[in-house]
Amino acid sequence: MSSSVYESIIQTRASVWGSTASGKAVVDSYWIHELGTGSLLVQTQLYSDSRSKSSFGYTAKVGNLPCEEEEILSQHVYIPIFDDIDFSINIDDSVLALSVCSNTVNTNGVKHQGHLKVLSPDQLHSIGSTMNRSDIKDRFQLQEKDIIPNDRYIEAANKGSLSCVKEHTYKIETCYNQALGKVNVLSPNRNVHEWLYSFKPSFNQVESNNRTVNSLAVKSLLMSAENNIMPNSQAFVKASTDSHFKLSLWLRVPKVLKQVSIQKLFKVAGDETNKTFYLSIVCIPNHNSVETALNISVICKHQLPIRKCKAPFELSMMFSDLKEPYNIVHDPSYPQRIVHALLETHTSFAQVLCNNLQEDVIIYTLNNYELTPGKLDLGERTLNYSEDICKRKYFLSKTLECLPSNTQTMSYLDSIQIPSWKIDFARGEIKISPQPVSVAKSLLKLDLSGIKKKGSKISETHASGSK
């Protein structure tokens, strides 16, 4: 998806921030980077509330693999051990992604928290208690995007009624590597001989309220959008398989699942780097408290040094056998995504027309001018448009005719953030301008082929819908 779609999703989720009825519900996102290279080792998003609890641990100290019969797995593996949660693992040549979804979870309207960390095998010296962003980048080899989201995403969150200002300094905390998240009896404080450095943004807003957030909270919203994390997700993990690791998840699910214990030692067919994976799943139900402890461990160990050029491979593992479909928890950003896709398609057609005519084209107007039809023949396709008595060109969408002709509609369309739009509130019009001739020629063929693909997926025919 494009960055503009991510902006729309962030704005929509920010607009319902904190509206959940569960005051103890929270989404925690974690990013752990490697000291020395700054590369992202793992990113995790966990949901917890008064009954659902989620925590995880990550370490580069793997040790010996358990003794199990080794298997070679390829493409799609189906192991139906759960009938009331959705659990899957996907592995390719660079990452392992793990997802646990349950219909006891609804992250819509839940507040997010972000936690940025760097993993080190040894304790560092001469690290102050506060550092600015540039010093963090130099000392820990992090990039700007690792620390703080792009301005456009912060602006999108603020348009969604949050209040976020970019921070410049961070409080640095050091601790032994241990379990993270809602640590409880299911995830004991298991220290590993590694160090974690945490970076907490220093709050820089004079006045604050319950809509005031730091930039890592916005980064958490962005992580949900980029990874298409569903609202019923209790745990999502994406770990780089370019490094040795042991990943542990300790979840408490507030319903009774059947007792399960499964272990697998395997390699993936087509993996030239010869990685070995170990998977352990233990499910312990408690009928008295109507809850289940779900403990998952994944180990990735390399038998050969990882080469830069890797042949692609993919493995999908499904562990669910849902007897009935969930009562789906709908993401509130879905309508915004549909509108954005429709308007992007309409604008793409209009841009082709605009580039060929080499003049501005109005794609929306509040005014009810008398228009006469016109046609532009492009060989493979004919674009219908209209023009007024002043010879100004129009490429209007029937979809937008259902909206009231007032400034609220203009403000709504402005919030969708199509980059090429020029919005004139005074005239009540939205128009686009021609691209440079060299750019237009190079993109014409791509535009038309891309539009044809989009048009086949969207029921409305925008080209013939002009008046």
UniProtKB/Swiss-Prot annotation:
Domain of life, source organism: Viruses
Keyword Nuclease on entry: no
GO annotation (BP), single: symbiont-mediated suppression of host innate immune response
Keywords from the named record: Host-virus interaction, Inhibition of host innate immune response by virus, Suppressor of RNA silencing, Viral immunoevasion
InterPro entries membership: NS-S_bunyaviral, NS-S_N_bunyaviral, NS-S_WIV_bunyaviral
Family recorded in the similarity comment: Belongs to the tospovirus NS-S protein family.
Subunit structure and binding partners: Interacts with host MYC2.
Function (record text): Multifunctional protein that plays two independent roles: viral suppressor of host RNAi (VSR) and viral inducer of host attractiveness to insect vectors (VIA). Acts as a suppressor of RNA-mediated gene silencing, also known as post-transcriptional gene silencing (PTGS), a mechanism of plant viral defense that limits the accumulation of viral RNAs. Also inhibits signal transduction by the phytohormone jasmonate, making the infected plant more attractive to aphids, which are the second host to play a role as a dissemination vector. Acts by binding to and inhibiting MYC2 transcription factor.
Name this polypeptide is given: Non-structural protein NS-S
Organism: Tomato spotted wilt virus (strain Bulgarian L3)
Organism placement in taxonomy: Viruses, Riboviria, Orthornavirae, Negarnaviricota, Polyploviricotina
Gene (UniProt): NSS
